[in-house]
């Protein structure tokens, strides 16, 4: 015990906490060349889109690390759980952002991006303020967001190389 902190009582899920911390660190590391390359392009849409994507990725892993690490009080656990689940919406929308702005662009890209972020914001509001929100509601929203790309699948396939499309599916 150090200063009243005992591992038995304070660490909630060390396995998940460690793997998500590793994910956060790796996301930060791989984001560096991505952001540098976007700045070198001089394309502000590319820069902003990739910053949004990397922040959403690091944010999700950071929130998840915090949620799975700390077992301080039921109130804090509940807040961290809400943040962790809300960040899933942010990551999905953040992942769409470069595809919609860089790959698609135009009315289709920005229209799809608007729909995705509206659903993400609604999902965040549900997670944060609708205390009794059934799990199926957020699950349906996650799945709907994931499948919305179908409306633009032909232009996405046409615009990406086979390798890039493979990475998108991964």
Where are the model-predicted features located?
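Multi-pass alpha-helical transmembrane bundles in non-GPCR membrane proteins
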Residues: 2-170
């Amino acid at each position: 015990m150090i200063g009243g902190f005992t591992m038995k009582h304070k660490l909630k899920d060390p396995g998940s906490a460690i793997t998500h911390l590793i994910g956060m660190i790796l996301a930060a590391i791989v984001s560096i060349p991505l952001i540098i390359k976007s700045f070198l392009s001089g394309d502000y849409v590319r820069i902003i889109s990739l910053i949004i994507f990397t922040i959403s990725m690091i944010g999700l892993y950071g929130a998840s690390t915090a949620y799975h690490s700390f077992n301080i009080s039921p109130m804090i656990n509940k807040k961290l759980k809400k943040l962790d689940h809300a960040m899933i919406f942010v990551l999905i929308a953040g992942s769409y952002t470069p595809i919609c702005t860089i790959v698609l662009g135009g009315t289709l890209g920005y229209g799809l991006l608007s729909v995705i972020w509206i659903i993400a914001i609604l999902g965040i509001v549900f997670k944060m303020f609708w205390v009794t929100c059934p799990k199926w509601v957020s699950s349906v929203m996650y799945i709907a967001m994931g499948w919305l790309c179908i409306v633009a699948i032909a232009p996405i396939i046409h615009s990406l190389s086979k390798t890039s499309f493979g990475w998108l599916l991964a």
